[in-house]
């Protein structure tokens, strides 16, 4: 079988890649990429998994769909490619990071350094049509990303799940909260950030949890240039 992900996720998800729902998703995507503008590009579909192997995941930050504007999405939730304006939700994440840990916001939105330290930046749907939010919902991605959450839940080493907003928090029912750590608040979107995202201190909470678990905390300070 063709290797889809080039690390430990391949073995963990290989059974899923053989299932009818995933085959259907593949056919759907093949057509979409041929006839529409789809984000992210095909080579970045599984960036979140490529950058954060299964055994290295310490924290999961769950997003929903990729950004649907040009040059934004590159396979990591909330992150945008270098040289692209920081989107409103991410600007609010930076505000909270500053309030929580004192880190000055950087002028880019490229979160790869978090991913490389064990922060799985996972969207529940991994593709979208240009300019059409939610256009690839219900096509099979949710089934695959639910399995990713289930596999992490089954893992012996605990994970810190950061769940912003109602859709992300619906996943709590799949997580054994006696073993794993849940940090939740409203979504950082400008529509909801003032309802409790601001002041929620997710970054220091995540690091405190990691230290309790005997893990190295995340350096949430992003590099100034990328």
Swiss-Prot record:
Coiled coil: none annotated. Gene3D superfamilies: Uracil-DNA glycosylase-like domain. It catalyses: Hydrolyzes single-stranded DNA or mismatched double-stranded DNA and polynucleotides, releasing free uracil. Keywords: Cytoplasm, DNA damage, DNA repair, Hydrolase. GO terms for molecular function: uracil DNA N-glycosylase activity. The keyword Lyase does not apply. GO terms for cellular component: cytoplasm. Its main location: cytoplasm. One of its GO terms (biological process) is base-excision repair, AP site formation via deaminated base removal. It holds the Pfam family UDG. It is found in: Cytoplasm. PROSITE patterns: U_DNA_GLYCOSYLASE. SMART domains: UDG (SM00986), UreE_C (SM00987). It comes from the Bacteria. The active site is at residue 65. Belongs to the uracil-DNA glycosylase (UDG) superfamily. UNG family. This is Uracil-DNA glycosylase. It comes from Enterococcus faecalis (strain ATCC 700802 / V583). The lineage of its organism: Bacteria, Bacillati, Bacillota, Bacilli, Lactobacillales. The gene is ung.
